[in-house]
């Protein structure tokens, strides 16, 4: 008796993900470390100087974390209400933050009590930053004002009242100590010059502005609000360079890579998009478990920190290069160990015995071998098999149809079992690689269960969905046939006209008397 031949699972080519340099670069991070904060993480900012600690603003506290620590190395909690936008100075020695009560506080990293308190805003301060000269602080608040403060004298220098709604974001120029940019819920982004009493540039974003970013060169400005990220050319008077719409929800934060070649944006849709600053196309993306409020990159992009609405801080560190450890040298086996048995000369009376390799059958093959056809079909309709390896399910259905027992395997099923079969058909019927097998299976199911249609509302809904899917597929086929007909007509026209293009009409030769030009009257005719 011949042995059982396992079912051949038909394999299909799978298009792999395109591997780029950005994919390799941004995937080279370890598993993220998650830290639970006391509230939503509204701001994350890295110190520009070693050891590159980062400040996390959440609830009424500011935590300073070491680059690789999971516990804060310092905490600032001298806030009466919610703290906002803790930002390091360029030398990493000072930290400035706003608060819900409108007070701007300046801290020394080595101390705990605030060095300075700037009081002048009447509502919550959501954005603060140091100017390029390190001696001034810019702040924007919900009282629609932007203020410039002097650190040594603890005094207010200028107040700009040109926004008509909350000022929620801003940044100072890294090159010019007199220039800074603010974004507001009045849909505008404005650039101010401390040497004047009004804005020197204003652009219309079109949505409430949640974040702004000024390139280190000062030539480009990025604004984020709504689902849009817009890039403006400041050297051309604020001309819109490109408008990006790659998020599904509001964009809340922006960040620039260390090299300045990649722009990162975080959104409430739980995604971080990475754009090329030359083509402004998405080159990579990260997915997170909750909506994103803040985002920061450390020096040389070694660490990515993301703050979320649920108070979770996600920290990812770049993988270190594997170092080859010098292992003790093993003693090599003697030469006779390798040639043992290879130089044996077969004798005439020797009998060679080969041990056949034992083949292990899959569970569905064991069921088919024992003629348990319904059990075999049930095994390949399990959720794990249906989702991960649908080609196995299709191959078993094809094998049952080849044996002529597919109708027997599908018959006699209850509501739950037939629903699983219909769900698989709905999921995969429109795929060209599975369609020939599944269409036949669908016809058999309809023939078997047609007399009992109407007895189960769940099964009836599945049949209605299957009917709609088939009708949609028929419409697609009709459109394809119409397209093929038009293409055949075009090809026929090209063949009939020879080398003439399709869009050129080559007229047939006309009789000679119709093509000659009218005779010009002679001088004799004119005189007569």
UniProtKB/Swiss-Prot annotation:
N-acetylalanine PTM sites in chain numbering: 2
Basic and acidic residues: compositionally biased ranges: 511-528
Glycyl lysine isopeptide (Lys-Gly) (interchain with G-Cter in SUMO2), cross-linked positions: 249
Short name of one Pfam family: WD40
UniProt keyword Repeat, yes or no: yes
Localization terms from the record: Nucleus, Nucleolus
Disordered: annotated segments: 508-528
Superkingdom classification of source: Eukaryota
GO BP annotations listed: positive regulation of rRNA processing; positive regulation of transcription by RNA polymerase I; ribosomal small subunit biogenesis; rRNA processing
SUBUNIT field: Part of the small subunit (SSU) processome, composed of more than 70 proteins and the RNA chaperone small nucleolar RNA (snoRNA) U3. May be a component of the proposed t-UTP subcomplex of the ribosomal small subunit (SSU) processome containing at least UTP4, WDR43, HEATR1, UTP15, WDR75. Interacts directly with UTP4 and WDR43.
Protein name per UniProt: U3 small nucleolar RNA-associated protein 15 homolog
Organism per entry: Rattus norvegicus (Rat)
Gene from which this protein is expressed: Utp15
């Amino acid at each position: 008796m011949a042995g059982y031949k396992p079912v051949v699972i038909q394999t299909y080519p799978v298009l792999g993900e395109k591997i780029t340099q950005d994919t390799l670069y941004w995937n080279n991070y370890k598993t993220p470390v998650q830290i639970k904060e006391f509230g939503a993480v509204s701001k994350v900012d890295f110190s520009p100087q070693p050891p590159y600690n980062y400040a996390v603003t959440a609830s009424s506290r500011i935590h300073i974390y070491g680059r690789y620590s999971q516990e804060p190395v310092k905490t600032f909690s001298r806030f009466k209400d919610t703290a906002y936008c803790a930002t390091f100075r360029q030398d990493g020695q000072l930290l400035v933050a706003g608060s819900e009560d409108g007070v701007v506080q300046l801290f020394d990293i080595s101390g705990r009590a605030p060095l300075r308190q700037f009081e002048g805003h009447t509502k919550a301060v959501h954005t603060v930053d140091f100017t390029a000269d390190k001696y001034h602080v810019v702040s924007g608040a919900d009282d629609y004002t932007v203020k410039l403060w002097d650190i040594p004298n603890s005094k207010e220098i200028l107040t700009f009242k040109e926004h008509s709604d909350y000022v929620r974001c801003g940044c100072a120029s890294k090159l010019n100590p007199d220039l800074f940019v603010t974004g507001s819920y009045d849909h505008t982004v404005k650039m101010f010059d401390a040497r004047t009493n009004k804005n020197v540039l204003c652009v219309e974003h079109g949505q409430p502005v949640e974040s702004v970013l000024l390139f280190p060169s000062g030539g480009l400005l990025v604004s984020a609000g709504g689902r849009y990220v817009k890039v403006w050319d400041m050297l051309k008077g604020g001309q819109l360079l490109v408008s990006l719409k790659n998020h599904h929800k509001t964009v809340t934060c922006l960040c620039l890579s260390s090299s300045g070649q990649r722009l990162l944006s975080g959104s409430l849709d739980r995604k971080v998009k990475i754009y090329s600053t030359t083509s402004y196309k998405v080159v990579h993306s990260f997915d997170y478990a909750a909506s994103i409020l803040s985002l920061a990159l450390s020096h040389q992009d070694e660490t990515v920190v993301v703050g979320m609405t649920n108070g979770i801080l996600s920290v990812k560190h770049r993988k270190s290069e594997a170092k080859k450890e010098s292992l003790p040298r093993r003693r090599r086996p003697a030469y006779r160990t390798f040639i043992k048995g290879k130089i044996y000369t077969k004798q005439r009376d020797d009998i060679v015995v080969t041990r056949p390799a034992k083949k292990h059958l899959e569970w569905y093959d064991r069921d088919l071998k024992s003629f348990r056809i319904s059990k075999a079909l049930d095994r390949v309709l399990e959720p794990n098999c249906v989702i991960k390896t649908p080609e196995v399910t299709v191959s078993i259905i094809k094998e049952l149809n080849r044996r002529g027992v597919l109708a027997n395997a599908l018959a006699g099923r209850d509501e739950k079992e037939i629903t699983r079969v219909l769900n698989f058909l709905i999921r995969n019927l429109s795929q060209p690689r599975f369609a020939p097998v599944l269409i036949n299976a669908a016809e058999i199911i309809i023939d078997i269960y047609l007399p009992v249609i109407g007895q189960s509302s769940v099964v009836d809904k599945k049949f209605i969905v299957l009917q709609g899917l088939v009708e949609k597929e028929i419409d697609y086929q009709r459109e394809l046939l119409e397209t093929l007909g038009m293409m055949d007509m075009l090809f026929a026209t090209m063949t009939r006209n020879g080398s003439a293009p399709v869009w050129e009409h080559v007229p047939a030769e006309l009789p000679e008397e119709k093509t000659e030009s009218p005779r010009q009257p002679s001088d004799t005719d004119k005189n007569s």
